[in-house]
Every structure is written in structure tokens, then in C-alpha cells.
């Protein structure tokens, strides 16, 4: 073979070898996407076919930057819960898998912001700055990572801190009929965390826009937005947003807890959450159970509230305190959702419509309220003065029923009733006016010592304010001792008793006048 032919052959060999090497090492730059189509769109849901590889609760993407969560995964089609405005979606539109689950922005940048469950800002303050993202659904802390509840969470409400104490890491249910002050108790608790190194997350689920705006205005006015994140879904939002709202709020709170911070999260309210889940389940043709709720409604709430805990020091020592709110109908505490949440939580605060109508605010029915773990976290200074108070108030509530029938009462019974009326008057307080620990202990000690018994009921509010103003003048070191595990010393007790007695002197009439002005 001639030299030119050899040269051509070797050149071709080199070329083919280079092509073979290129084919062997070639990696396609194309990313495969699984695309399905919408078969049907209904209120808040869409049925989708053509996504055989989709996972349960995987996020899927629709046109118009609308997302949904795969809720029902069947062999031929999936049921998707829509998380945005779906008015433009129609049968035949494409649907794409994202390969990830729903998550939310977390971090210090959310403090002071009002967002929706997707992390989108609602307050016209620009985009949300976040340091990380966390999945909405996260497993609760293992048992061995949890620590006992030992530190109190002061609400600033005398009736709660004294008789139904809450600890950091506890789950305390707030329930009552409509318009009985449930949200007011939660908001007052948030206001009282100012200066307490507690961050707050307020989650409004399916609430009226006007009511949410009022709550946010109160938080801004009192300076509470500095340490609060507000997660909002309105009544006209898709039910899917209402369903994921409490999980988003909990993930935001868990981020701070895992950093070693103490966090308070308020769910207002889980009745709307249960109704949104019921609506979605019925639309997806899931079998209904009691009151048409699906069979897993208990699990839906238990897996949410089990994420509230107090972590061991090795895990950072943070805590997440949950205050779920539930609305009852006609004072029926034994309905399905209320009984579920009573069994899940560590106690409940029940608000009575009867007390509300009498003007007793907050309208807490102490006999139907309980805190199962908060008592262990209550400060010793409280325990020293509240034990006798609980007994006296319970006796008063029992005897008050008989007094309404106009029965003749002996002198001792009349004293118990008069003392109980003054306890009830002292436990009342206006909205958005939390009371300091020193003020509460001074008032409660004066109540236990029966110093208020000589004060006419009409002057109880002024008398209590006088005691609170006097308590504000206590030495700083004495006020600091209240917030420790130390018991009240005899000297401190004597100081408080003398202070209360001096403050009440102008309000106690002479004996003859006292007999004329005492309540029947």
C-alpha cells in the first residue's frame, strides 16, 4: 500500500477512535421532567394524571406559578391540594413534578413580618430575607431529646399565672364559644413576652381580614412585632393554604427552638384548620367519619402539637410552647374536635359565655380549666400564695349557686361568698394590660390575707390599682427574687403585706360604713 493510503488510514483510525471516546464519555445535558395533565379542577383541588413517579405530599407545579401538594396517590391519577389562585387552571393543562416537598423560609429576617404559609410577604415591607428553609412536615423531637417543663411562661394574666400556670414547652388549649375572648388571652400572652427573651409566632387560620388586621395593629402598637412572626390565611383563601398554615408556623418556630431560643406559637384557631381538612378530604372522596371529619383528623393535630417541647441542654435547651385555640358550640366541650385536642394537650383554659355576659374578663371558668404540667414550673413565690386561693375560690363558686336562690345564709357562709366575690374582682383585668410578676404576687398575697374583704365591690378596681402601683416601687433585688426558685422569706412576705395594707387603707371604710355598703 502506498504511503498516502497509509496516512489516510491512520488519520481515519484516529478520527473514529476520537468519536468512540467522545460517545463513551458523553453526558447528556438534558434534564428529564415528568409532566402530567389536569383531568379535573374543583374547589381547592385538582385531579391529575400522567405522573406515575410522584410521591406522597410532593410539591407539583402548575402554570401561572401555582403549586400544589400531592395528597391522594392512586394508580391512575393523583389528587392535588392547590395552594394558590386556581381560577385560570383547566382540564388538559400541564402539571410538572418538582421532586421536593413543601418548605418555608425561616430565620431572624421573619421577625416583625406578616407572611402567608408559603413565605410570601403580606405587609408591603419588601421581600422576606431568610437564612434557611425548612420542610413543613418534620418529625417531632425524640423522647430522649426532651426535658421536663421547669420554667414558667408568664402570661401577664393573674387568673392564668396564679391558678392555671403554663410552662415553657407546654401545650395549653384555649377553648370557648364565639366572642368570649380566646384571641385576647393569646395576644395578651404575646404582649407579656416583651423583655422575657421569648420569640412568638402568631398563626391566623381562616380568619376574617378585619379581625387579623386588628390583632396586628395591637401587636404593632405595643411593640410586640419586634419579636413576633405573623402567619396569615384569610377566610377567602384556598382551603389548602389554611391546612398548611399551622405546619408552616411550627417550622418557623422550630428553627428558633433548635437555636436554643424559647418560642411561643399561637394557633388561632384549629377549628378552622379541622374544617379546611374536612373540606379537602370530602372533595378528594376520602371516607368520612364522625361529624364528617376523616378518620385521621386526630393524627393531623397530634403530629402538629407533638412538635411542641422543651429540649435537653445537649440539644440546645430551647423550647416551643403551643397555645392552640378551639371554638366550641353552645358550650359543648364534648364535641369531636374539642375532646381530641383536650386529650392531646397538657391542659385547657375554658372561657365561659356566662361569665363573659356578667362582665367577668377574662371569662376563665377555673373549675373547668386545668394545667397538668405547668404547676411544676410555677415559681415558689406563686405557690406560697395560690394554694389557699384555689380552695377559697372553689368554695365560693359552689356556694354562689345556693345564694342565687335567696336562701338564708349563716355568717360564715356569707363571709366565704364576700371573699370569693373579691377574688373574682381581683382576677379580672382589661385587655392588653399584662401585670408584672411582682404586682401579681402582691395582689394575690393581699387577697389571701383577706385585706380586700373590707373594700366595697364598687371600689375594687381602684383598690387593686393602688396595690399594683405600690408594688412597682419595690426594690429591684426583691422583684428579681420573685423570678427564682426561692420561696418567699418571712421578711419579704412581711414587706409585701405591709405594702398592701398601706395601699388599701384609703379604700377600707370605717366598720359602720362597711356594714352599710357591703354587697348582699
Swiss-Prot record:
<keyword id="KW-1003">Cell membrane</keyword>
<dbReference type="Pfam" id="PF02874">
    <property type="entry name" value="ATP-synt_ab_N"/>
</dbReference>
<keyword id="KW-0066">ATP synthesis</keyword>
<comment type="function">
    <text>Produces ATP from ADP in the presence of a proton gradient across the membrane. The alpha chain is a regulatory subunit.</text>
</comment>
<keyword id="KW-0375">Hydrogen ion transport</keyword>
<dbReference type="GO" id="GO:0043531">
    <property type="term" value="F:ADP binding"/>
</dbReference>
<dbReference type="GO" id="GO:0046933">
    <property type="term" value="F:proton-transporting ATP synthase activity, rotational mechanism"/>
</dbReference>
<dbReference type="InterPro" id="IPR000793">
    <property type="entry name" value="ATP_synth_asu_C"/>
</dbReference>
<dbReference type="InterPro" id="IPR036121">
    <property type="entry name" value="ATPase_F1/V1/A1_a/bsu_N_sf"/>
</dbReference>
<dbReference type="InterPro" id="IPR004100">
    <property type="entry name" value="ATPase_F1/V1/A1_a/bsu_N"/>
</dbReference>
<dbReference type="InterPro" id="IPR027417">
    <property type="entry name" value="P-loop_NTPase"/>
</dbReference>
<dbReference type="InterPro" id="IPR038376">
    <property type="entry name" value="ATP_synth_asu_C_sf"/>
</dbReference>
<keyword id="KW-0406">Ion transport</keyword>
<keyword id="KW-0139">CF(1)</keyword>
<dbReference type="Pfam" id="PF00306">
    <property type="entry name" value="ATP-synt_ab_C"/>
</dbReference>
<dbReference type="GO" id="GO:0005886">
    <property type="term" value="C:plasma membrane"/>
</dbReference>
<comment type="subunit">
    <text>F-type ATPases have 2 components, CF(1) - the catalytic core - and CF(0) - the membrane proton channel. CF(1) has five subunits: alpha(3), beta(3), gamma(1), delta(1), epsilon(1). CF(0) has three main subunits: a(1), b(2) and c(9-12). The alpha and beta chains form an alternating ring which encloses part of the gamma chain. CF(1) is attached to CF(0) by a central stalk formed by the gamma and epsilon chains, while a peripheral stalk is formed by the delta and b chains.</text>
</comment>
<keyword id="KW-0813">Transport</keyword>
<feature type="site" description="Required for activity">
    <location>
        <position position="369"/>
    </location>
</feature>
<dbReference type="GO" id="GO:0045259">
    <property type="term" value="C:proton-transporting ATP synthase complex"/>
</dbReference>
<feature type="binding site">
    <location>
        <begin position="176"/>
        <end position="183"/>
    </location>
    <ligand>
        <name>ATP</name>
    </ligand>
</feature>
<dbReference type="InterPro" id="IPR000194">
    <property type="entry name" value="ATPase_F1/V1/A1_a/bsu_nucl-bd"/>
</dbReference>
<dbReference type="InterPro" id="IPR033732">
    <property type="entry name" value="ATP_synth_F1_a_nt-bd_dom"/>
</dbReference>
<keyword id="KW-0997">Cell inner membrane</keyword>
<comment type="similarity">
    <text>Belongs to the ATPase alpha/beta chains family.</text>
</comment>
<dbReference type="GO" id="GO:0005524">
    <property type="term" value="F:ATP binding"/>
</dbReference>
<keyword id="KW-1278">Translocase</keyword>
<dbReference type="Pfam" id="PF00006">
    <property type="entry name" value="ATP-synt_ab"/>
</dbReference>
<dbReference type="InterPro" id="IPR017710">
    <property type="entry name" value="Alt_ATP_synth_F1_asu"/>
</dbReference>
<keyword id="KW-0067">ATP-binding</keyword>
<keyword id="KW-0547">Nucleotide-binding</keyword>
<keyword id="KW-0472">Membrane</keyword>
<dbReference type="InterPro" id="IPR020003">
    <property type="entry name" value="ATPase_a/bsu_AS"/>
</dbReference>
<dbReference type="InterPro" id="IPR023366">
    <property type="entry name" value="ATP_synth_asu-like_sf"/>
</dbReference>
<protein>
    <recommendedName>
        <fullName>ATP synthase subunit alpha 2</fullName>
        <ecNumber>7.1.2.2</ecNumber>
    </recommendedName>
</protein>
<dbReference type="InterPro" id="IPR005294">
    <property type="entry name" value="ATP_synth_F1_asu"/>
</dbReference>
Amino acid at each position: 500500500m502506498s504511503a498516502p493510503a497509509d496516512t489516510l488510514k491512520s488519520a481515519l483510525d484516529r478520527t473514529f477512535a476520537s468519536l468512540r471516546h467522545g460517545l463513551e464519555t458523553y453526558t447528556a445535558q438534558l434534564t428529564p421532567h415528568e409532566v402530567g395533565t389536569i383531568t379535573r379542577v374543583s374547589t381547592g383541588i385538582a385531579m391529575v394524571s400522567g405522573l406515575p413517579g410522584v410521591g406522597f405530599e410532593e410539591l407539583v407545579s402548575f402554570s401561572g406559578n401555582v403549586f400544589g401538594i400531592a395528597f391522594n396517590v392512586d394508580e391512575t391519577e393523583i389528587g392535588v391540594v392547590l395552594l394558590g389562585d386556581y381560577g385560570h387552571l383547566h382540564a388538559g393543562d400541564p402539571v410538572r413534578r418538582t421532586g421536593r416537598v413543601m418548605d418555608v423560609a425561616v430565620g431572624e429576617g421573619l421577625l416583625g413580618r406578616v407572611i402567608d404559609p408559603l413565605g410570601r410577604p403580606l405587609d408591603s415591607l419588601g421581600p422576606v430575607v431568610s437564612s434557611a428553609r425548612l420542610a413543613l412536615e418534620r418529625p417531632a423531637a425524640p423522647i430522649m431529646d426532651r426535658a421536663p417543663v421547669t420554667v414558667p411562661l408568664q402570661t401577664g394574666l393573674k387568673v392564668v399565672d396564679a391558678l392555671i400556670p403554663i410552662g415553657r414547652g407546654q401545650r395549653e388549649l384555649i377553648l370557648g364559644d364565639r366572642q368570649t375572648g380566646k384571641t385576647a388571652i393569646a395576644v395578651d400572652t404575646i404582649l407579656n413576652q416583651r423583655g422575657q427573651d421569648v420569640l412568638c409566632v402568631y398563626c391566623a387560620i381562616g380568619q376574617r381580614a378585619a379581625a387579623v388586621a386588628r390583632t396586628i395593629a395591637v401587636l404593632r402598637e405595643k411593640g410586640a412585632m419586634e419579636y413576633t412572626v405573623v402567619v396569615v390565611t384569610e377566610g377567602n383563601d384556598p382551603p389548602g393554604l389554611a391546612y398548611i398554615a399551622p405546619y408552616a408556623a411550627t417550622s418557623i418556630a422550630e428553627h428558633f427552638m433548635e437555636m436554643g431560643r424559647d418560642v411561643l406559637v399561637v394557633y388561632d384557631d384549629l377549628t378552622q384548620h379541622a374544617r379546611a381538612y374536612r373540606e379537602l378530604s370530602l372533595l378528594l372522596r376520602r371516607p368520612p367519619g364522625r361529624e364528617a371529619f376523616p378518620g385521621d383528623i386526630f393524627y393531623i393535630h397530634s403530629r402538629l402539637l407533638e412538635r411542641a417541647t422543651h429540649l435537653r441542654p445537649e440539644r440546645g435547651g430551647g423550647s416551643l410552647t403551643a397555645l392552640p385555640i378551639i371554638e366550641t358550640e353552645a358550650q359543648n366541650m364534648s364535641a369531636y374536635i374539642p375532646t381530641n385536642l383536650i386529650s392531646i394537650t397538657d391542659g385547657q383554659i375554658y372561657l365561659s359565655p356566662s361569665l363573659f355576659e356578667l362582665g367577668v374578663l377574662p371569662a376563665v371558668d377555673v373549675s373547668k380549666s386545668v394545667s397538668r404540667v405547668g404547676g411544676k414550673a410555677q415559681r415558689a413565690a406563686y405557690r406560697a400564695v395560690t394554694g389557699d386561693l384555689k380552695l377559697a375560690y372553689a368554695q365560693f363558686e359552689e356556694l354562689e349557686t345556693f345564694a342565687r336562690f335567696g336562701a338564708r345564709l349563716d355568717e360564715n357562709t356569707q363571709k366565704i361568698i364576700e371573699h370569693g366575690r373579691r377574688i373574682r374582682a381581683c382576677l379580672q383585668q382589661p385587655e392588653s394590660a399584662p401585670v408584672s410578676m411582682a404586682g401579681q404576687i402582691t395582689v394575690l398575697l393581699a387577697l389571701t390575707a383577706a385585706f380586700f374583704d373590707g373594700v366595697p365591690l364598687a371600689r375594687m378596681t381602684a383598690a387593686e390599682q393602688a396595690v399594683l402601683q405600690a408594688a412597682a416601687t419595690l426594690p429591684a433585688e426583691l422583684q428579681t427574687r420573685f423570678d427564682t426558685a426561692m420561696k418567699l422569706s418571712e421578711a419579704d412576705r412581711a414587706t409585701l403585706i405591709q405594702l398592701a395594707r398601706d395601699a388599701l387603707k384609703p379604700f377600707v371604710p370605717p366598720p359602720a360604713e362597711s356594714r352599710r355598703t357591703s354587697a348582699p
